[in-house]
């Protein structure tokens, strides 16, 4: 399956009004257990490169405050919805993958693939067991969406296998795709 197949699924579900109602009462369309090749940077719409650059810079800063995403304006509504009243979140992917607090997973992945290019151990775990007690702290609603990413080199090409708990096809996918390209 490729991005075009995912797109067609969502178009068909929308046309046939096959919705799941989320906790806010909003109609959503789900595709549970999808496995596909991310061969396009967007499922719907066009990536906003200016915003992507800001989000990646924020990830690299390892700040867990959404007010640091866009110094010139408001953070995106989705981040505001997920954040505490103080702007704190759990899902800064740079913090989760590069900070010593989380064992500098990126460094370990690079070392592993440098030492053993055929390895299947080059994994980064984004989510964590403690998220059950952290996701709603101080008014947050941020249960990390990416569970884990495995990296492999095959035929001199880096392959990422991304396992998501949840991913928004309109906004989230574009930014997650860009993050994996940066990684």
Label the model's feature ranges.
Residues 1-182:
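Terminal, non-catalytic protein-protein interaction segments that mediate quaternary/complex assembly
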């Amino acid at each position: 399956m490729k991005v075009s197949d995912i797109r067609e699924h969502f178009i068909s579900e929308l046309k046939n009004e096959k919705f799941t109602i989320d906790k806010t009462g909003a109609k959503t369309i789900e595709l549970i257990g999808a496995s596909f090749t991310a061969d396009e940077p967007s499922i719907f719409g066009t990536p906003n490169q200016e915003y992507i650059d800001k989000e990646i810079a924020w990830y690299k800063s390892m700040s867990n405050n959404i007010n640091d995403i866009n110094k010139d304006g408001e953070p995106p509504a989705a981040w505001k919805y997920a954040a505490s009243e103080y702007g704190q979140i759990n899902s800064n992917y740079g913090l989760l993958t590069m900070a010593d607090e989380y064992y500098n997973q990126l460094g370990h992945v690079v070392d592993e693939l440098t030492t053993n290019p055929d390895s299947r151990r080059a994994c980064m775990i984004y989510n964590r067991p403690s998220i059950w007690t952290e996701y709603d702290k101080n008014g947050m609603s941020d249960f990390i969406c990416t569970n884990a990413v495995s990296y492999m080199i095959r035929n001199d090409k880096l392959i990422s296998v991304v396992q998501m708990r949840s991913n928004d096809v309109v906004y989230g996918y574009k930014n997650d795709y860009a993050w994996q390209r940066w990684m």
